[in-house]
């Protein structure tokens, strides 16, 4: 299926590893131009070696001023994938100020800032666009030791709807994806304990975790005109976890 992404320009945050990196590669394979944003220079260098033509931007999205400066000169974008996130796991009674500040800065505030920059460019050019926020099943289910992470993703759930409401008149669609555990290299490591994995798998009707391509395919669909009447939605990629 041709998603019509060829020739369009996309910006992807959290592009150095995992879902973000795979999204960059898939967009390039579909013919899009891609700006890849990561805080880790080594990851960007490796990505450019694998996929020449990707435009790398190295910046820590937790730093508002640095982000403003770094993204002010990247040029116009038709598509945006807000994928960058941190997961600092602490039980409620042990949540620290540092965990709150870092998590909300990256998981929520940066989404607002980057989306503002990109959306203002779309509006100034008078072109339609699409934004996909990579959220989590944790946005709608309480998970032990995920107090701050669940809270930031819950806020992102409503932010997605607000962005859709206010950007819709400018022909900018905004949606989110809610993956379950995803088998990125980090995901495979973090969920390698069979007992830990079983506790989560028992809550997933399909009985398996998501592969990276399951999430990436959903992101590309939401970026494409094939989902042209879809905005303000959050699409689970969770094997039925949220149905239980």
Swiss-Prot record:
Pfam families: adh_short_C2 (PF13561). NADP(+) binds at residues 11-39. InterPro entries: L-xylulose/Carbonyl_redctase, NAD(P)-bd_dom_sf, Sc_DH/Rdtase_CS, SDR_fam. It is a peripheral membrane protein. It comes from the Eukaryota. The modification Omega-N-methylarginine is found at residue 21. Its main location: membrane. One of its GO terms (molecular function) is carbonyl reductase (NADPH) activity. Its EC number is 1.1.1.10. The modification N-acetylmethionine is found at residue 1. Keywords: Acetylation, Carbohydrate metabolism, Glucose metabolism, Membrane, Methylation, NADP, Oxidoreductase, Xylose metabolism. The keyword Acetylation applies. It is found in: Membrane. GO terms for cellular component: cytoplasmic microtubule; membrane. Belongs to the short-chain dehydrogenases/reductases (SDR) family. Catalyzes the NADPH-dependent reduction of several pentoses, tetroses, trioses, alpha-dicarbonyl compounds and L-xylulose. Participates in the uronate cycle of glucose metabolism. May play a role in the water absorption and cellular osmoregulation in the proximal renal tubules by producing xylitol, an osmolyte, thereby preventing osmolytic stress from occurring in the renal tubules. Homotetramer. This is L-xylulose reductase. It comes from Cavia porcellus.
């Amino acid at each position: 299926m041709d998603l019509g992404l060829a020739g369009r320009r996309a910006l992807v945050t959290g592009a150095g590893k995992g879902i973000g990196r795979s999204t960059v590669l898939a967009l390039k394979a579909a013919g899009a131009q891609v700006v890849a944003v990561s805080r880790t220079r080594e990851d960007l260098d490796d990505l450019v070696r694998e996929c020449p033509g990707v435009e790398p931007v190295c910046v820590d999205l937790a730093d508002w001023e640095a982000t403003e400066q770094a993204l002010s000169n990247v040029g116009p974008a038709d598509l945006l994938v807000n994928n960058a996130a941190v997961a600092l796991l602490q039980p409620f009674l042990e949540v620290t100020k540092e965990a709150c500040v870092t998590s909300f800065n990256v998981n929520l505030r940066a989404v607002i800032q980057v989306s503002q920059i990109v959306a203002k460019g779309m509006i100034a050019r008078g072109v339609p666009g699409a934004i996909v926020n990579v959220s989590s099943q944790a946005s709608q289910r309480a998970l032990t030791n995920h107090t701050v992470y669940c809270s930031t993703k819950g806020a992102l759930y409503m932010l997605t709807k607000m962005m859709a409401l206010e950007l819709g008149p400018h022909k900018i669609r905004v949606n989110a994806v809610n993956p379950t555990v995803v088998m990125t290299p980090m995901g495979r490591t973090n969920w390698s304990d069979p007992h830990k994995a079983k506790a989560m798998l028992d809550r997933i009707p399909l009985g398996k975790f998501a592969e990276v391509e399951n999430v990436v395919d959903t992101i590309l669909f939401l970026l494409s005109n094939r989902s042209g009447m879809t905005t303000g939605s959050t699409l689970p990629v969770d094997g039925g976890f949220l149905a239980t």
